[in-house]
């Protein structure tokens, strides 16, 4: 199966491959690095760089599944999308996360608080009222005093965040945006 996926990804020059179940529904997204890597290598370049994950939205476009679970916990294969995003940052050494939560916040907190053996921390900021796409960042300014990443809880990109951090710092940029 690994060789088959690798061949298809090479043929189509793609960094990722969506896998569908028998009914044609998205079951998992496999990334190039997952196929070619024999072990998960964690560098510590970003060990002191926090990540803010925006997970407060209602996920209206994902209804009816988000009637039951928040979009941050929508599964892709074996893991919720927000955990996959966190794992991508952890591979670059990130150890500290802040999550902006609102809709079904208790489910997000319970899930992440019960992950066995996780090697990172998550502090939660709850919006008492919706503050917009990035409004809750203002609630975190007393906790974050250095360069940090911001990620939505529902967008996967295959990127080495260490490279992005080096680019950002080398150019003395105020803001660096990666979009998909």
Indicate where each model-derived feature is located.
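The conserved cystathionine-beta-synthase
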Residues: 1-14, 19-21, 36-39
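Conserved N-terminal catalytic core of the sugar/cofactor nucleotidyltransferase
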Residues: 7, 42, 47, 79-156, ...
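Short hydrophobic beta-strand segments in globular cytosolic domains
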Residues: 26-27, 156
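Short hydrophobic beta-strand motif reused across regulatory alpha/beta modules
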Residues: 27-33
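N-terminal nucleotide-binding beta1-loop-alpha1 segment
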Residues: 34-68, 74
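Structural beta-sheet core signal
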Residues: 51-53, 99, 150, 175-178
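Conserved donor-nucleotide/metal-binding helix-loop-beta segment in metal-dependent transferases, i.e.
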Residues: 159-180
């Amino acid at each position: 199966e690994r060789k088959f996926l690798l061949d298809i990804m090479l043929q189509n020059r793609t960094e990722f491959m969506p896998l569908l179940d028998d009914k044609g529904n998205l079951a998992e997204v496999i990334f190039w690095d997952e196929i070619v890597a024999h072990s998960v290598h964690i560098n510590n370049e970003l060990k002191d760089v926090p990540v803010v994950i925006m997970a407060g939205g209602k996920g209206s476009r994902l209804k009816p599944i988000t009637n039951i679970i928040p979009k941050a916990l929508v599964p892709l294969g074996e893991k919720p999308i927000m955990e996959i995003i966190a794992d991508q940052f952890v591979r670059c050494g990130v150890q500290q996360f802040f999550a902006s939560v609102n809709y079904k916040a208790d489910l997000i907190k319970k899930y992440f608080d019960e992950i066995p053996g996780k090697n990172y921390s998550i502090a939660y900021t709850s919006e008492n009222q919706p503050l917009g796409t990035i409004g809750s960042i203002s609630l975190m300014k007393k906790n974050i005093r250095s360069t940090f990443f911001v990620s939505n809880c529902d967008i996967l990109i295959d990127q080495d965040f260490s490279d992005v951090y080096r680019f950002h710092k080398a150019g003395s940029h105020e803001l660096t945006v990666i979009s998909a």
